[in-house]
């Protein structure tokens, strides 16, 4: 999808005194898909695509309105790609033309900075969508600015094809980095992780926010004097504790569609 890709990692078994009492209380939740509303709905008029028929990616000039704000850049990028399709002979789906077919890809490629385009050639970019017939943005959060860059956390829901002719939902989370170029915000890097729905229900504890804090900062570091109740607002989990060193600590996690938790700050 134009990003570096890695499977979701949950950590490896450790030799420290892992607490066997830390168990998933509701394993069924790890198998359930998302019901969140989608966010990439900025382009509901398909006439937007009319000027770009028969144009190569290097002939396209995006309207400046699409990249004037950081939020706008991310949501417009994925709005362009929402109904893009790159199904293959080995990854089939649908019953005829799907969405806007491959028309959106050269348009979306122009949301990248020139430097990112040098790092990710167009053919490689197109191949990163192989098997995908639909993309929804279901979570989007701006993170604290870094020097020269504006980062975002994102979670995507895709519909993908299989060789046996069925389609399935897949979920990815990751990070997008924007760079301001001539007063416009362009995508300078993306990295996505595929979500696994069969690991957390059976193995490890690194996917559970409360277990991460209790194990790493309590059992291992003896840093927790008093851990306060977890606060949850939607998919954002906040865990506070008072340290044995007298300091106050706060950890923020995002809960993914597969109900695993990712440490954000």
Question: What is each stretch, according to the model?
Answer:
Residues 52-131, 212-265:
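Core segments of small alpha/beta cavity-forming domains
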Residues 105-112, 138-143, 156-160, 207-208:
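Short, charged low-complexity intrinsically disordered segments located at boundaries
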Residues 126-149:
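A short, amphipathic edge element
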């Amino acid at each position: 999808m134009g990003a570096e890709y890695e499977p979701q990692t949950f950590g490896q078994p450790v030799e420290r005194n892992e607490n066997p009492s830390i168990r998933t209380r509701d394993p069924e939740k790890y198998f359930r898909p998302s019901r969140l509303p989608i966010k990439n709905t900025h382009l509901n008029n398909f006439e937007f695509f009319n000027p770009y028929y028969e144009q190569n990616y290097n002939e396209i000039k995006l309207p400046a309105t699409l990249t004037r704000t950081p939020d706008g850049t991310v949501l417009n990028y994925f709005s362009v790609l929402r109904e893009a399709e790159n199904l293959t002979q080995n990854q089939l789906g649908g019953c005829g033309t799907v969405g806007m077919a491959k028309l959106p890809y050269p348009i979306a490629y122009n949301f990248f900075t020139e430097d990112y385009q040098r790092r990710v050639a167009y053919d490689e970019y197109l191949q990163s969508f192989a098997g995908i017939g639909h993309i929804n943005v279901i979570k989007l959060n701006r993170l604290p600015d870094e020097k020269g860059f504006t980062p975002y956390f994102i979670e995507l829901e895709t519909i993908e094809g299989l060789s046996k002719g069925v389609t399935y939902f897949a979920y990815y989370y990751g990070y997008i980095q924007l760079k301001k170029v001539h007063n416009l915000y362009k995508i300078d890097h993306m990295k996505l992780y595929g979500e696994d729905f069969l690991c957390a229900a059976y193995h490890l504890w690194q996917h559970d926010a409360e277990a991460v804090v209790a194990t790493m900062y309590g059992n291992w570091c003896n840093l927790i004097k008093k851990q306060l109740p977890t606060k949850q607002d939607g998919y954002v989990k906040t865990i506070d504790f008072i340290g044995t060193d007298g300091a106050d600590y706060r950890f923020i996690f995002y809960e993914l569609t597969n109900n695993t938790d990712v440490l954000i700050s």
